Amino acid sequence: MTDIRIEGAKIIIVGGNSGMGLALARRLLGEGAAVTIAGRSEDKLAAARRDLGDHPGLATIAVDISREEEVATLFRNSGPLDHIVSTAADIEGAYQLLPTIELMAAQRVVESKLYGPLLLAKYGAAHLPPSGSITYTSGVAAYRPAARGSVVAAVNAALEGLVRALAVELAPIRINAVSPGWVDTPIWSFVAGDAKQATLDSMAQRLPAGRVGRPEDIADAIRFLIGNEFTTGTILHVEGGHRLV
C-alpha cells in the first residue's frame, strides 16, 4: 500500500467538534496535519479547542453545511486543501415511529447527511489536488434497518449512492465513506436518552466483536481511506460484525 503523506496536509473535518470527528482531528493533528474543524455550534467548537489543547495546527470555523452560501464561503476562504471529511449528522427527533415522526426532523437528517455532503463536494472539489479525497460517514442502518430508523436508513443509503457517483464524476479525487455500526458517541443521547448505556451494553452482547465501537475505531478507518490512494467509491464497514447478527 502506498500511504499518502499526512504531515503538513490541510484537512477540513465537518462535524469534528465531538465524537468520531473529534477523535479523527486528534489523530491527524498528532501526525502533523493542519486541521480545520467546521461545525454549527460556536460553543462546541470552543469545547473542541479546549479538548485538543489549542493545538497550533488547529483552526475552527462556524458553518452550517445545509446552507449553500455558507459552504461556498467556507471554501472560498480555505485556499488549497488536501482532504475533506464529514462526520456531521443531525438526527435529533428522527428516530421515531412513522405515526409520530415530524417532517422537519426528517428534513434535518437529509440536510446534514445528503445535501450537506453534496455541497461539500460541489464547492470543495475544486480546492483539492488529484491525490485528494473526500470521506463521508453513512451507517449500518442502511443495511440493518429497524423500527424507528426508516429516515436514517434511507438517507444513509442515499449518501452511499452519492459516494459512488461522485467517485466517477470527480476522479481522480477519491470519494469514500465509512459505515459505522453502533459507536459510543454523544449522538446516542438523542437516540436512547436515559437508556443510552443499557442500550449500548445490550448491543455489545450481540456483536461478534464483543463491544460497541469507540470514536477511535472510526477515526482509524477514515485515516485509512484518506491515506490509501487506490481506494475510491468504497463503503468501508466498521461495525463489529453488526451486519452478521
Which role does the model predict for each range below?
Residues 17-18:
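Conserved glycine-rich cofactor-binding loop
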Residues 31-47:
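Conserved glycine-rich Rossmann-like NAD(P)H-binding loop of the short-chain dehydrogenase/reductase
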Residues 52-69:
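Rossmann-fold cofactor-recognition segment
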Residues 85-95, 240-241:
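Conserved NAD(P)H cofactor-binding loop of Rossmann-fold oxidoreductase domains
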Residues 90, 97-110, 114-120, 131-171, ...:
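Catalytic loop of short-chain dehydrogenase/reductase
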Residues 160, 169-185, 231-238:
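Conserved Rossmann-fold SDR core element
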Residues 196-217:
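Catalytic Tyr-x(3-8)-Lys segment
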Residues 211-238, 243:
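C-terminal substrate-recognition "lid" of short-chain dehydrogenase/reductases
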